[in-house]
From Swiss-Prot:
PANTHER family: CYTOCHROME B. Pfam families: Cytochrom_B_C (PF00032), Cytochrome_B (PF00033). Heme b b566 binds at H97, H196. Keywords: Electron transport, Heme, Iron, Membrane, Metal-binding, Mitochondrion, Mitochondrion inner membrane, Respiratory chain, Transmembrane, Transmembrane helix, Transport, Ubiquinone. This is Cytochrome b. GO terms for cellular component: mitochondrial inner membrane; respiratory chain complex III. It comes from Ctenomys frater. The keyword Membrane applies.
């Protein structure tokens, strides 16, 4: 008789995805982030569900309902801070996951890569709308500034913004719809994750060498299940340390002031994980240009499979490309720092230089360096 694990119509799907899945024998800790993102998504949905039980999506009571969750609900403070800091962990892992994909050439799996870019957009949209819900000063003004960017779209822009707002400013209608979208999007993300995995399992995982590993595969369980559990344990230690000791470290103090349309905060800025894109947006002194640069900074990821000119897939054996990769990481850290600074000298020029360097590195330096390395190897 066949093992139920291999014959049951539902269980065999799980079996082929997480148990008997042939995996490369040499994948490093950089391959842990996919499963960690799955853990983060599960945690966010779970904590979000409990928060939604006590939250009210109304401009008059939203701020008070969050205060009520923290003060009066059993372990409400824990659920709220797990959710807020869980989002930060989510983005840290997302950026590591994407960075790993760029370094090891995983973007050559085009279907998996492109659905991944769509996932990034969906997660960013969800996080942005979630930040609006506590209805603090930064929630309100962040929503106003970012939604207002759409007015730069020619002809339909102003109408589109009013349509999204549900009125002539960010108000009750905006908050209600943002809550509705913030609730539904994680489930859409979960479905997209399944498609992401479906495409991945069509090809199998990449590995640090960038070469075909069909001749050297091991079963996912127990090797990578135990490795993923260890990764999740480290993640929980980091997250719980953050939540228990410095829960507001990554937040903005302005968000502890209830939203006031008559009083603008001195520095409007998004959460830390959007600062690099915000810096690129601000570095162009033109509304439409800034919006296009902002969109391009993420959409540029879809070009990686096209601008990959090296005959090697991975950067493991390409020292010059490695230098450029770390230059890009440093550049993104500079952009993140600039995004949180006021718009004044010298931050303006630093932001503009870093923005130019970002696009120049990806579009010009990386492909030309790849060609140079092939030449040096006489390929």
């Amino acid at each position: 008789m066949t093992n139920t694990r291999k014959s049951h119509p539902l269980i065999k799907i799980v079996n082929h995805s997480f148990i008997d899945l042939p995996a490369p024998s040499n994948i490093s800790a950089w391959w842990n982030f996919g499963s960690l993102l799955g853990v983060c998504l599960g945690l966010q949905i779970l904590t979000g569900l409990f928060l939604a039980m006590h939250y009210t999506a109304d401009t008059t009571t939203a701020f008070s309902s969050v205060a009520h969750i923290c003060r009066d609900v059993n372990y409400g403070w824990l659920i709220r801070y797990l959710h807020a800091n869980g989002a930060s962990m989510f983005f840290i892992f997302l950026y590591f996951h994407i960075g790993r994909g760029i370094y090891y050439g995983s973007y050559t799996f085009m279907d998996t890569w492109n659905i991944g870019v769509l996932l990034l957009f969906a997660v960013m949209a969800t996080a942005f709308m979630g930040y609006v819900l506590p209805w603090g000063q930064m929630s309100f003004w962040g929503a106003t500034v970012i939604t207002n960017l759409l007015s730069a779209i020619p002809y339909i822009g102003p109408t589109l913004v009013e349509w999204i707002w549900g009125g002539f400013s960010v108000d009750k209608a905006t908050l209600t719809r943002f809550f509705a979208f913030h609730f539904i999007l994680p489930f859409i993300i979960t479905a997209m994750v399944m498609i992401h995995l479906l495409f991945l399992h069509e090809t199998g995982s990449n590995n640090p060498s960038g070469m075909n590993s069909d001749s050297d595969k091991i079963p996912f369980h127990p090797y990578y299940t135990i490795k993923d559990i260890l990764g999740a344990l480290f993640m929980m230690i980091m997250l719980m340390s953050l939540v228990m000791f410095t829960p507001d470290l990554l937040g903005d103090p302005d968000n502890y002031t209830p939203a006031n349309p008559l009083n603008t905060p001195p520095h409007i800025k998004p959460e830390w994980y959007f600062l690099f894109a915000y810096a690129i947006l601000r570095s162009i002194p033109n509304k439409l240009g800034g919006v296009l640069a902002l969109a391009s900074s993420i959409l540029i990821l879809t070009l990686f499979p096209i601008i990959h000119l090296s005959k090697q897939r991975s950067m493991s054996f390409r020292p010059f490309s490695q230098c450029l990769m770390w230059l890009l990481v440093a550049n993104l850290l500079i952009l993140t720092w600039i995004g949180g600074q006021p718009v004044e000298h010298p931050f303006i020029i630093i932001g503009q230089l870093a923005s130019v360097t970002y696009f120049f590195t990806i579009l010009i330096l990386m492909p030309s360096t790849a060609l140079m390395e092939d030449k040096l190897l006489k390929w």
